Every structure is written in C-alpha cells, then in structure tokens.
Amino acid sequence: MLETLRERLLSVQQDFTSGLKTLSDKSREAKVKSKPRTVPFLPKYSAGLELLSRYEDTWAALHRRAKDCASAGELVDSEVVMLSAHWEKKKTSLVELQEQLQQLPALIADLESMTANLTHLEASFEEVENNLLHLEDLCGQCELERCKHMQSQQLENYKKNKRKELETFKAELDAEHAQKVLEMEHTQQMKLKERQKFFEEAFQQDMEQYLSTGYLQIAERREPIGSMSSMEVNVDMLEQMDLMDISDQEALDVFLNSGGEENTVLSPALGPESSTCQNEITLQVPNPSELRAKPPSSSSTCTDSATRDISEGGESPVVQSDEEEVQVDTALATSHTDREATPDGGEDSDS
C-alpha cells in the first residue's frame, strides 16, 4: 500500500516536471517562430502585451503551484520516509515474531525436557535427603558406639583400679589379720603358759602331799600362786577337791599313765603351735556341792571329757574355770568374716 502511494507520488512529480519542460519548450518555439516575421506585418503590441501578461500570470501561478506541490511533495516524502521507517520496524518485529512463533514447538519440547529433568532432579534430591538422614543416623550410631566404647573402657579401668584397690585392701587386711592372729596366739600362749605353770605348781604341791601322806587334807585356804594377769582363776576350787578316798596307788598310776598317753596322742595333731602344751594337765574344776556329792573317781572323767574337747577343737587346749570369762576379739572375727565375704561382693559390684 505504501509502495503504491509512493509510486503515485513519484509519477505525479515526473508528470509535473515533464509539463514544465513542455511549457518551456513551447515558449522557446514561439520565440523562434516570432523572429522570422517580416516587416510588412506590424505587430500588435497591445495584444501581445495582454497575451504576455496572461502568460506571465499563468506561469507565475504554475510556478507558485509547482513550488507548493514541491513543498507538499517534500512533506509527503518526509512523512512517507517516516512511515516507511515505522513500518520497517513493524515488519522486523513481525518477522521476529514469526521466527519466534516458528521456534515455539522447539521451546515447548525444551520445556517438557526441562520438566522431566526437574522431576528426575526432585527424585534425586529426595534420595539424597534420605541418604543424608541415613548418614546422620549412622553418625549418631557411631557416636553412640564410640561413647559406649569409651564408657566400657572407663568401666574396665575402673574395675581394674577397684580390683587393685581390693587386692591391696585384702593384702592389708590379711597382714593386719595375720598380725592380730599372731598377737592373739602369743597372748593366748602366754596365758596358757602362765596358767599351766600355776596348775603345775598347785598339782605338784598336792601330788607331793598326797605321795607323802596318801591323802589330801587342806587345813586352811592358801593364796593363789603365781600371777594370772587378766585371767581370774579361783584357786580355792582346787583346794576343795577331796582325794582322800583314792587309796589305790595302782589306780593313780593308771590315771597318770592315761593322761600322759593322751597328751602324746594329742601332740602330733596340735602341730608346732601346741608343742609347748604337751605336758599340760587339764582339770575341770567342779563346784563345791558337786565335790561333796561325787566320788573321787570323777577326776578321770573330767580329764577324758577335756581331752575330747581338745581333740574336737583342733586348737591349743584352754583350761577355764566355771567362774572364768574369756572374751573373744569381736572386731577381729568381724574383719575376718568381712574379708571372706568381700571378694564375692566385690566381684558382684564390678560385674
């Protein structure tokens, strides 16, 4: 449409220029034709003047119109140039739009592929997230196992330390117990020796009196012979023993021999600790009422019962009167009992 309008404007301009050229050529021809006029024909100046003025006016009008047409053509040309530039831009835009529209199927295919890739990436991200959660759980388990291993090592070290402390404590208790046992045995041996000495002296005096007179007759009470320290022995109980009815010397010899044989039998069983007590004569001191009621033969029975007690106990013979009180070291016995029960309890606590 614009091209046809432009062609028309160009054709009008060409026609206008060709018309001007034809007019100028005609005026020149008229001038050339007017020259060969001869003198006989006289010009009519008034008619020519009118004609010339009319031509001049016409040419002036034509020239003015030509200028107006030229200015209008220039304006139209500028407008046409502007419109052509504008429509060229529109054309390029339309061409680009057409090209973009032609690229729409490829763009849609790319979008579909991108959507599929995004779906695949979403699945991959979910898998990675699950793997990260699993890795976090594994890290937590590893940390827990490491803490458990450290705690177990600390527990083992604590057990080892406690076992060492227990062994040290047991060794100390054993040493203390052995020391106390030795002290108690020494004290007991001293008491036994002192008591044995006292009874030997009393028995020797009574035996000498019996061998010399044949009977025992105590006229007055005698003071205890020897120092008994912590042991309280009532010697008057021995003085109240009445042996006057023993008239048979053979029975006395049998009694003495039986006592010596029993002592020799007991000495190997008692071991080295009782070697000092082999010559000890054990007597059971009866009450005064029992002495009056029982015959003199009860002394042998007392000796046999004491001998059986010694053999059953398996320890050094201890002679006690009815009124004597021997207190056992309860602290030592308690510590010994705790020591025997401690290893089992310590092992239970360690486990």
Swiss-Prot record:
- Compositionally biased residues, Polar residues: 296-305
Quick one: where's region Dysbindin?
Answer: 173-331
Q: How is this protein annotated for GO cellular component?
A: axon; axon cytoplasm; BLOC-1 complex; cytoplasm; cytosol; dendritic spine; endoplasmic reticulum membrane; endosome membrane
Coiled coil spans: 88-181
Pfam families according to UniProt: Dysbindin
At what positions is Phosphoserine found?
S11, S316, S321, S349
Q: Name one GO biological process term.
A: platelet dense granule organization
Q: Which InterPro entries match?
A: Dysbindin
Quick one: where's region Disordered?
286-351
What are the alphabetically sorted keywords of the record?
Albinism, Cell membrane, Coiled coil, Cytoplasm, Cytoplasmic vesicle, Endoplasmic reticulum, Endosome, Hermansky-Pudlak syndrome, Membrane, Nucleus, Phosphoprotein, Postsynaptic cell membrane, Schizophrenia, Sensory transduction, Synapse, Ubl conjugation
Q: Which domain of life is it from?
A: Eukaryota
Q: In which tissues is it expressed?
A: Detected in brain, in neurons and in neuropil. Isoform 1 is expressed in the cerebral cortex, and hippocampal frontal (HF). Specific expression in the posterior half of the superior temporal gyrus (pSTG). Higher expression of isoform 2 and 3 in the HF than in the pSTG while isoform 1 shows no difference in expression in these areas. In the HF, detected in dentate gyrus (DG) and in pyramidal cells of hippocampus CA2 and CA3 (at protein level).
Q: Where is this motif: Nuclear export signal?
A: 243-256
Q: Report what the Swiss-Prot or TrEMBL entry states about this protein's PTMs.
A: Ubiquitinated by TRIM32. Ubiquitination leads to DTNBP1 degradation. Isoforms 1 and 2 highly phosphorylated by PRKDC in vitro. Isoform 3 only weakly phosphorylated by PRKDC in vitro.
Q: Which disease is it linked to?
A: Hermansky-Pudlak syndrome 7: A form of Hermansky-Pudlak syndrome, a genetically heterogeneous autosomal recessive disorder characterized by oculocutaneous albinism, bleeding due to platelet storage pool deficiency, and lysosomal storage defects. This syndrome results from defects of diverse cytoplasmic organelles including melanosomes, platelet dense granules and lysosomes. Ceroid storage in the lungs is associated with pulmonary fibrosis, a common cause of premature death in individuals with HPS. Defects in DTNBP1 are associated with susceptibility to schizophrenia, a mental disorder characterized by a breakdown of thought processes and by poor emotional responsiveness. Genetic mutations lead to alterations in the glutamatergic transmission in the brain and modified Akt signaling. Protein levels and expression are reduced in nerve terminals of the hippocampus and there is an increased release of glutamate in schizophrenic patients. Levels of isoform 1 are reduced in the pSTG, but not in HF, by about 48% in 92% of schizophrenic patients.
Q: What is known about its subunit structure?
A: Interacts (via its coiled coil domain) with KXD1. Interacts with CMYA5, PI4K2 and RNF151. Component of the biogenesis of lysosome-related organelles complex 1 (BLOC-1) composed of at least BLOC1S1, BLOC1S2, BLOC1S3, BLOC1S4, BLOC1S5, BLOC1S6, DTNBP1/BLOC1S7 and SNAPIN/BLOC1S8. Interacts directly in the complex with BLOC1S5, BLOC1S6 and SNAPIN/BLOC1S8. The BLOC-1 complex associates with the AP-3 protein complex and membrane protein cargos. This BLOC-1 complex also associates with the BLOC-2 complex in endosomes. Binds to DTNA and DTNB but may not be a physiological binding partner.
Summary of the function given for this chain in its UniProt record = Component of the BLOC-1 complex, a complex that is required for normal biogenesis of lysosome-related organelles (LRO), such as platelet dense granules and melanosomes. In concert with the AP-3 complex, the BLOC-1 complex is required to target membrane protein cargos into vesicles assembled at cell bodies for delivery into neurites and nerve terminals. The BLOC-1 complex, in association with SNARE proteins, is also proposed to be involved in neurite extension. Associates with the BLOC-2 complex to facilitate the transport of TYRP1 independent of AP-3 function.
Q: Which family does it belong to?
A: Belongs to the dysbindin family.
Q: What is this protein called?
A: Dysbindin
Query: What species does this protein belong to?
Result: Homo sapiens
